[in-house]
Amino acid sequence: MNWWIVLSPLFCGLVVFFIRKDFMQYTLLIGTLLLMRQWGSRWWNVLAVCILGVFGLFLHEAYLFWGIPLSVAVLYGYTRRPAVAVASSLLFIGCFALMCVYKGDSSNVEAILDSWHRLLGDEYHKSGLSIVALGWNAVHTFWVHFNLNFHVSLFEVNVGWMGAVIQLLFFMAAYYFILNFSWTFRRQTSDFTAADRTNLSAIYLLCALTLLPMFTILSCDYSRLYQYLFVTSYAAVLILPRGVCTAMLPGRYLTYVGRMNASIDRYLPSSKGLMVLLLLLLAVAPYSLNLYLAFEYSVVGTISEIFMRALRWLVHLV
């Protein structure tokens, strides 16, 4: 397995915020996969996985759309019992429903912000903190995110709802990248087999489907969303046995994904040069659709920024 993909902003996200709950949830998910690999379908292990899933939800409810689907799929892959998958799904959905009902209101927002103000003083701005979303109603939340996601301006040019097309094109580029990077740079066939490639892309597409509400009406934080996709997909393929990855996904679905990947190989074959180019340039803005900001967060943009800062420092010394 080639680890250079970790350098991609799509994989590492905003690592400067490593203390955020997202990275705690990644740890929970990886722990869940390790538990299942070690102890399998034992009843107490299934219970432990469910407890970890509930804890992940209480860390951040977005876990329902990426960590929970994979956890349920893994439970089914090991137990081969639909009842276990259904029961665990109902448990997680029930917890999520309770969180939606008791999410808090504007008074809770003010209490939280006031407590922060006593600690941080004037070093934060209330209008720029996502915590204020606790006071929003559902319709307002959906519309704000939908508008940010698809009705956008690029380089000061208003492209309107063409943002939806741009989003789709970027998603296709990200899929092509994750599909081919490890495959193109594998040293031996056994390092990353054709089955691994199919499983990786199938899990990626499945997580993308379950994350669709986040990509449309519940979020606009693309650095987090694509990191969810990349970390989840690679964690599953690297930790779980190949047979479990295959068993937890529908056979027809895997066949369809395999055929789609074969078509991509036929019409747009990969190369090491193309993969390096995507590694250096393919990035996404932390939030909303902004090509300039996306370039700043790319590997090339980051190196350029470091170079310019060093140059300004040298000029200042002179």
Please state what every model-predicted region is:
Residues N2-T27, F58:
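Aromatic- and kink-enriched transmembrane "portal" helix at the membrane-lumen/periplasm boundary
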Residues Q25-G53, P69-S71:
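Specific aromatic-rich, kink-prone transmembrane helix
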Residues T32, T184-N199, C245-G273:
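Membrane-interfacial, low-structure loops and terminal tails that flank and connect transmembrane helices
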Residues V46-E61, W66-V72, G94, S263:
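Membrane-interface alpha helices of multi-pass inner-membrane proteins
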Residues F65, C220-R242:
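Hydrophobic/aromatic-rich transmembrane helices and adjacent perimembrane loops
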Residues G67-F92:
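Perimembrane helix-loop-helix junctions
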Residues V84-I178:
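Membrane-lumen/periplasm interface segments of specific transmembrane helices
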Residues F192-F215:
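Transmembrane alpha-helix segments characteristic
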